Amino acid sequence: MGIRLVRMDQPGAVDTEVIWEYLQSCRARTEDEAAGLGPLEGCHSLDEVRRFGLPEVARQARGDDLPSGFVPALQFAALDPDGKLVGTIQLRLRLTEALLRTGGNIGYSVRPDCRRRGYAGLMLDGCLRRAAALGMRRVLITCSPSNLASRRTILSCGGQLENVLPSRSGQPVERYWIELPTESTGQRTRQHEPV
């Protein structure tokens, strides 16, 4: 099993119908199951994906004229060997105060019917490699204490719990840092099997 991470800001990287179908499959479970989609989270039709979502993904990747509180971010689609969109992951290239507190550098989601197959770990590992290649030294990843699968994924990729803070809504958020390899330290290795 493997995945290929493709940047969603590249024209034609992922078909808009595939993205829309992914959004629908995530939302069929619950309204907030489409985390890790960045600006695509707000799309409620195929037309919105085309006219708003993907252009906004490209704008965030360029860092052009971002609204207050937004940072440059790269959006990736995780495709299995058959080309099925199994997950999405976003790498935020900087942290605002809010992201530093409870948002982090990385957000991800896995298609509901593809969970518990190791995709989240593969996606996070690939995203961490991209972050290191961009010169990032460490990244912050957060999750809810009740999201045991995400916690295991973060730990499997080297996450170290710093603390637990309340979100704006008062819900606890676990904050994990992952140190990234530099040229002198070599490759980071996974500590556990993917979940």
Spans of model-derived segments:
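Conserved GNAT acetyl-CoA-binding A-motif
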Residues: 131-142
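Conserved catalytic-core motifs of GNAT/GCN5-like acyltransferases
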Residues: 142, 155-175
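Conserved beta-strand-loop-alpha-helix junction that forms the acyl-donor binding cleft
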Residues: 141-151
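Conserved acetyl-CoA-binding loop-helix of GNAT-fold acetyltransferases
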Residues: 107-110, 116-133, 152-156
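GNAT-family acyltransferases
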Residues: 1-105, 112, 130, 169-195
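Charged catalytic carboxylate motif
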Residues: 18, 123, 149
